[in-house]
């Protein structure tokens, strides 16, 4: 076995199937997941945790220690991968300007453990602690605290028998969720090691890898297919779960259930546009009014009219923006690009075409979301201009080779279409 993995969240069924097939031992399953796979709940400590990102369930986090990185690339081939350059629970020292590397540090402690990696550009610290997969130990008021996942009173009393002697010596102990699944002897030995490491300041090897994966629509559709092999699953299950949790569960009780009504309900008269960059950061583009839509069991197509206001020039096209200019753009669940056709507000003449290359767009309530693949194409006075190919190469640190190659393949396909006058 490659390691013990705990999986939580809306992707749990599909990921349990996938990581089991990759020779990982699945532990601490929910009763529902155990029943689906006709197995007993495996109550063993986890080396790695995979779960929904609490601020956006369109992303997952992976944390722990183990050789999982290559498997993550293979499972999520068309998604963005961010690996923290600083390990979770590692001990770092901030400089005088309250930074570490290129990241701001809060609070501005001279030394502390990383309790939030810098996925938003900021490291959050707490006072220095010795950390294992079972517990944290540090000098303080001599108190014991528990993970929110340890809520059974009997279990808390069991753990207190071990931590109370250390509390009396002035050590704080925080029990992590894995502690529920270890023997008293294992925990006792672990606490002893933590105290020694804390007093000897042996923090060099402390910390856990942390990955934040922004899921693409193609990878979610793959997870739909995997889940479908285990339990009844409609197409777009994982997309719809982000907006309609209970409704999807109800729909799937009917083996002939169709996702069409739920997909249609996601489309409002005006749609926002969430343009996600390779580092996971979202840019909100000017949204647009829906002027045409088509939804069926296989997918969806939405055409927007976006009003373009302000000064400046049209990116890539180079023509000045004038009052009343507008953009007609189609978002198609089957296409890895969107064609923006910019028109003059004065005489409705075509000013130019800009093609954004991205993963196929997904729908949330009143919003279109896609992963931007950096490389774009503009058509200006019959001239084809390839934009930001160097940015694609720079941002490839966040993409697996399959996604980089796909972006280049789509760009070449579009160039051929333009040259043959077959752009649709």
From Swiss-Prot:
Its EC number is 3.1.26.-. Signal peptide: none annotated. The keyword Hydrolase applies. SUPFAM superfamilies: FomD-like. The keyword Membrane does not apply. Pfam families: DUF402 (PF04167). GO terms for biological process: rRNA processing. One of its GO terms (molecular function) is mRNA 3'-UTR AU-rich region binding. It comes from the Archaea. InterPro entries: DUF402, FomD-like_sf, Ntdp-like, RNA-bd_FAU-1. Keywords: Endonuclease, Hydrolase, Nuclease, RNA-binding, rRNA processing. HAMAP family: RNA_binding_AU_1 (MF_01910). Belongs to the FAU-1 family. Probable RNase involved in rRNA stability through maturation and/or degradation of precursor rRNAs. Binds to RNA in loop regions with AU-rich sequences. This is Probable ribonuclease FAU-1.
């Amino acid at each position: 076995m490659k390691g013990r993995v705990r999986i939580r969240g809306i992707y749990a069924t599909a990921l349990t199937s996938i990581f089991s097939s990759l020779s990982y031992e699945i532990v601490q399953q929910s009763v529902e997941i155990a029943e689906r796979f006709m197995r007993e709940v495996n109550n063993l400590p986890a080396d790695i945790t995979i779960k929904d990102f609490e601020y956006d369930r369109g992303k997952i986090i992976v944390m722990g220690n183990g050789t999982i990185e290559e498997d993550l690339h293979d499972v999520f081939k068309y998604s963005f991968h961010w690996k923290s350059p600083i390990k979770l629970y590692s001990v770092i020292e901030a400089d005088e300007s309250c930074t570490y590397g290129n990241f701001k540090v809060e609070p501005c402690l001279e030394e502390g453990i990383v309790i939030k990696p810098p996925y938003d550009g900021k490291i959050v610290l707490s006072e220095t602690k010795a950390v294992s997969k079972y517990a944290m130990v540090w000098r303080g008021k001599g108190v014991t605290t528990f993970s929110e996942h340890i809520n059974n009173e009997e279990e808390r009393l069991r753990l207190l028998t071990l931590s109370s002697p250390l509390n009396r010596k002035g050590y704080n102990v925080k029990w992590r969720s894995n502690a529920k699944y270890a023997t008293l002897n294992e925990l006792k030995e672990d606490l002893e090691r933590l105290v020694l490491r804390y007093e000897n300041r042996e923090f060099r090897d402390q910390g856990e890898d942390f990955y934040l994966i922004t899921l693409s629509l193609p990878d979610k559709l793959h997870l739909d297919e995997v889940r479908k092999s285990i339990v009844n699953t409609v197409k777009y299950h994982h997309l719809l779960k982000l907006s309609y949790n209970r409704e999807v569960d109800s729909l799937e009780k009917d083996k002939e259930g169709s996702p069409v009504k739920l997909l249609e309900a996601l489309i409002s008269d005006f749609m926002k546009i969430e343009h996600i960059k390779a580092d996971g950061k979202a840019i909100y583009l000017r949204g647009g009014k829906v002027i045409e839509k088509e939804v069926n069991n296989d997918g969806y197509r939405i055409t927007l009219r976006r009003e373009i206001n302000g000064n400046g020039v049209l990116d890539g096209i180079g023509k000045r923006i004038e009052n009343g200019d507008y953009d007609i753009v189609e978002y198609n669940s089957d296409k890895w690009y969107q064609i923006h056709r910019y028109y003059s507000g004065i005489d409705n003449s075509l000013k130019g075409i800009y093609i954004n290359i991205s993963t196929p767009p997904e729908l949330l309530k009143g919003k279109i979301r896609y992963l931007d693949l950096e490389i774009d194409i503009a058509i200006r006075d019959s001239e084809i201009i390839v934009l930001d190919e160097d940015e694609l190469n720079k941002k490839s640190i966040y993409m697996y080779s399959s996604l980089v190659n796909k972006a280049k393949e789509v760009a070449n396909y579009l160039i051929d279409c333009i040259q043959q006058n077959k752009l649709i």
